[in-house]
Curated annotation (Swiss-Prot):
Coiled-coil segments on the chain, per record: 247-355, 415-472, 701-946, 975-1037
Residues holding ATP: 32-39
Protein name (record): Mitotic chromosome and X-chromosome-associated protein mix-1
Family from the record: Belongs to the SMC family. SMC2 subfamily.
Organism of origin: Caenorhabditis elegans
Amino acid sequence: MHIKSIHLDGFKSYQKHTDILDFSPTFNAITGYNGSGKSNILDSICFIMGINKLDNIRAKSMHELISHGGTKAIVQVRFDNTDKRCSPFGMEHLDEIVVQRIITAQATGKGCATSYTLNGHAATNGKMQDFFRGVGLNVNNPHFLIMQGRITTVLNMKPEEILGMVEEAAGTKMYDQKKKDAEKTMFLKDAKLKEVDRIFQSSIDPRMVKFREDRKNMVEVTRLKKLKENFSRKYEAFQYFQTCEAVKKSAKEIEDAKKGIEDLGEKFNQLDLDLKNKEDEKKKMEESRDDQHEEAALSAAHLSKQSIMLQKETVKNQLVETINKLKKEGEQINKSLSKDREVLDAKRKEHEDSKAANSKDIQSQSDDEALVTKYRNDLESLTRGTIANDKGEHVSIESEIQSCKSTASQMSSGITAAKKRGERLHNQIKHLEGEKATLSARSKSDIGSADNYQKEVDEINKQLQLLGFNIDADTEKREHAAKLHESITKLKDMDTRLLNSYKDGRYALNYQRPPLHIDKFDEKRDVFGYVAHLIKMKPGCEQFAVAADIALGGVLGNVVVSTQDIARILIDGKAFTSRKTMIPVSENARNASSYNTLPDVKLRRAKEIAEKYNDTVTKMIDLIEYPDFISNTILNAVGQILVVDSLDVAREIAYDEVAKTRMITRRGDDVRTNGIMTGGYNDPGNKPALIALEPMYARRPQIEAQQRELDALNRELQLTEASSQKCRDLNNQLATAMRKLAQVKTNINNSEFGIVVRDLKVHSEEYEKNQAEIEATVKTLKDVEDKIKTLESMKNKDKNSQEKRKKELTALLQKAEQTVAQNKNRGEKARREVMLLQATVEEMEKTIKKDEGIWEQKKKECDELEEKLPNAIAALKDAELEQKAAQAKLNDLKNNQRQISTRLGKIAKECDALIREKAKTKSKREEKEKELTSLQQSEASNRKEARSKLKKFEWLSDEEAHFNKKGGLYDFEGYTVSKGKDEIKELTDKIETLERSCCIQNVSNLDTCEAKVLDIKNKRERITEDFNMLKKTIATLDKKKVDELIRAHESVNKDFGQIFNCLLPDAHASLVPPEGKTVCEGLEVKVSFGGVVKDSLHELSGGQRSLVALSLILAMLKFKPAPLYILDEVDAALDLSHTANIGMMIKTHFHHNQFIIVSLKQGMFSNADVLFQTRFADGHSTCTRLNGGDIAVLCQDKVLQAQALELTDAGKAKKDAAAKKGAQKNDKEPPKKKPIVVDDDDFE
């Protein structure tokens, strides 16, 4: 690829459009006067290749590249691409490549805008630089470009700079640049990766954690919402179930109420009957109470006995006063008593004899008086002509006969009417029996069903009797069990409310049943609750509650479970919402330790210290009560803690060498042996846990007792469950059978057959009753007729017989009266005699008894004086017993009367109670009727509510079969409306809390974010892998660079020596590393003439140095040929012969490369294939291609020769000055590396 033409417009001195055409593919020369624009053509080539260092094209800014007065500069270069061997990558199909660059001036202060086009398409600076680099034309580090002054620069180069030229020739310079760019990019990428890591750690990872927590919370919200929906369904189902149960209960209560009303009516009638019976009993007892005769007799006897007792007491007192007199009188009384006893015996015998002798007379007098009374009544009846009727009244015989005849007539009429009625009933019965026979065939099926149902009822009753199960007692037990369960639930609810209200539910045991190992877990058996639920203060120790609260501390919040397995199940199942410490009861024995109790030595020392301050020491373990299964745990917690009143005492004991133990004051100050003290308890409004939970402890025995009773009932019910179920089934069957039987009987009774049977039964009963009345009336009529006959016979007797009977009765009466008169005196005398003797005997008995009592009393009084009168006391006691006996009889009578009065009072009260009960029963019946109305309304309301629920929640009908099924979703055991509300509210609160804490957008974006984060991490890993691979590649390329550099040095050094020897025979030049260094650290030029090596290039002449520099440059060009070489007046310091030699060498050795050389010397451009001449006229430059004649004329141009000579001299002088300046600088300063300037465009 070589330049075919150049087109300039507004670039530097080429103000007008200029076309430079037909460049040679090999040697091109440009000549012209000084200032005519030769170098500007070369600058335009550098400019289009994208040079960044404007100093190399003699400009400070882009504005200076635009012609004076212009606003835009255009440079277009056409390349010939017919040689495909060196064609740029991807452009092998093009024969011509056009590159154009435009500079446009912008507003003041905004610089210039530049743009590229490649084959008519816009391109970037980086793309164009890569395009030229691809063919070996790196304008920013060029080895193909030798501008004015480059020879001098090469001569003054340091070893490092010469090495850089070799590197550029070898191609490693671009690698170094790319390496630096890559290292810079790697540095930036590494910083970016670190920044990404930092962002991940500080922002993205926490945010992703938050996103995942939000997703977890959202999953939990979804689960809780589902659970809430289930709870809501259960709540609604429970209400619907309760409503349905209430309907059933209301129906039963309505039946009970109706039955109750009937029972109350019967009770009301029974009370009325009882009230009448009580009033009759009351009347009889009042008559008995009013009899006073017996009371008077017993009262007199009691007074007599009491008088005797008083007399004996008087005798006793007299004996005490005069003991000697009593002894003498006692002897006289003893003698008198002997005589009196003899007389008494005689009188008794006389009294018995008198009774035997006079008893006949007394009885005879009584019989005679009765006979006189009888005769008088019979005579009176006979005289009047009357008889005694059934009522005992005296009526005439005639009136009695008429009364009997009237009665007989009425009876005969009644018998006739009854017979007619009987005949009529008999005819009706026969007619009904015919109808019954006719209709029985029609009702045969109903009658058979009734018989079958009756047999079924009888069979079921027989089975119930054989079963012998008391269903009423079983029902009472079940009702009692339900009441116990309800009571336990209420008590536990009270405990739950108490625990939830104390310190925001700190000791409320709320946990979820573990989803795993359900068969191994029993809540009642395996979870005992918090330690705070199991311990309490001993009675009378409540003032130490604050100290106990401080001592136990966190132990109160530990959960007591049965075994380690249960603790592991609860922990693995995440049953609690926060971390909990488990205390397995099975490990209680392992918690025992010899260090959990306070040694006696310490306790004695503590008491000694406390006594000095009049304080008392109490062991904390003695203040609390706790169950044995956590004893070692409690001992480990408070076994060595003592309680005192004073903080000073607590400190002294805690810090004492002997007593040294933990101390707590009553108000809560905690003093430890290590010097840590915790302040007192200063919030009186906040009760200690053991005081606040005291109501729960008080209710626990009641709960346990009721639970034991409930368990016993449940066990008993479970044992009888089979019988109970069988009995209930039989009762249900019996009720069904009876209902069917009643239905069949109702059908039969309502049918024609039933009506006929019912009428037949009524008529038959009436007929039988009528026949019985006829028989009774006939019998009574016969008796009446017999009585009439007797009365008529009595009426028809003659008067003579009556008179004779009257005389007989008169005589008998007179005789009886005479007998009574005769025997009256004798009987009265006998009676008086017996009574007098009886009175005498009684009086003597009394006297004897009195004397005996006196004698005994006196004797007892004497003995009492001698032996404290024991006999007198005994006699007095006897008298008292007699008095008490009499008093007892009187009291019995009075008690009897009082009992009667009490009984009357009770009867009166019972009557009042019956009256009240009657009124109460009436009131109850009215209340029952009102209750019945209310129940009916309640039933209707419940039915309406149930229908409303069913209409609102249609799923209830589908799920109703699962209601109250144990273990199912709708298990209502222990379930209440308040519990359901609490569960729903708790779930709602949890859902709201979780929804507030999580962002739905985060959850929806989580998958995208995770994918992006994963993609970023994968890219980072790939970048990291590429980064490491790049490092390895750089290390490999560094090694290859050294190898390539050595190879390039050898090749360049060989060509350098040959070219320099060719230009300057008998001279040799070489590139060698400085002393003590390697090729990779720097190179310097060594020249020898005739085998003599020059120590420095300063020893050479200016021309020789120029030849050295040119030889080196040409050696570089030969090592790595480029498609294009640009040389700007490189022959300035050479004479014509050397210039011609260089031109000939270029033409001979570089015939595959295109050279564009600016020169003023004939020796150079005479060897060129194409020569261009520049001119400057009218303020702008032009360039023309010269033919053969023009070249001959140009060779004779004196001005051009003069300028070339001036240039040669100036060049030599400039080289000498630069050489001297460089030598001085090298002597004063060590060589420095040339700074590397990297433009931002390299990274696009």
